[in-house]
Amino acid sequence: MRSRALPTLLAASTAAIVYARYGRPWQLTWGATPAEVSRPLPGDELVTRPTFNATRAITIAATPQEIWPWLLQVGVTRAGWYSYDILDNLGRRSARHIIAELQNLAPGDVVPMSPNGKAGTPVLSMDPPASMVWGTPGESTWTWQLDANPDGSTRLITRVRSRYRWLSPSIAMSLLVEFTDIWMMRKMLLNLRDRAEGLVTEPAR
């Protein structure tokens, strides 16, 4: 038993070291510049000393005003998450157009993350079309920052900050997010870009 356990332990230790040295830094900063990673963003003050602090970014050939409506309508039972719909939107295809009736999101509203609305993230603050912060103070925040570039494009920066509660049952979900969040977020940013740039449209009827 001991002879079989040792190789498994060594393999697990090696994998953990490789992830900590290479995988985690990459996934926590995908697409973002060092300056974007280190700069303060709205909502940072709501979660101090986060265990998980991820800043990702993408350049979109559209203005903040053109991108903002796509962010206002996200959520399960709304426009979806523009990510892997089979996983985060009950298999329903995320919207490929702006939905007028979903443009009234405001601080105090909840962005739904489950079909029954019991799971969701509150909108904490909003500065259209520059920034929006979701989350629960002291636990987790999700910030969207839109910075206009001189050429008419936008740097869309997203930051997720959370503190792991190691002795809580929620730690299982936190660790799941640790390893899967990058793939969902990357897909969402790429699909947001394509929609805002007009590369994704509704099929002809």
Walk through the language-model features, giving the residues of each:
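Short amphipathic, positively biased membrane-proximal segments
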Residues: M1-A57, Q65-E66, A79-W81, Q145-R155, ...
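Beta-strand cores of secreted/periplasmic/IMS beta-sandwich domains, seen most often
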Residues: A57-A62, E66-P69, Q73, T180
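Structured segments of extracytoplasmic/periplasmic soluble domains
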Residues: W70-T77, R195
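Short, solvent-exposed aromatic-acidic interface loops
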Residues: P137-G138, R159-R165
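Hydrophobic pocket/interface hotspot
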Residues: I67-W70, V123, L156-T158, L192
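Short beta-edge strand/loop motif at the mouth of beta-sheet-based domains
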Residues: R49, G75-S131, P203
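A conserved amphipathic terminal alpha-helix motif
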Residues: W166, S170-R205
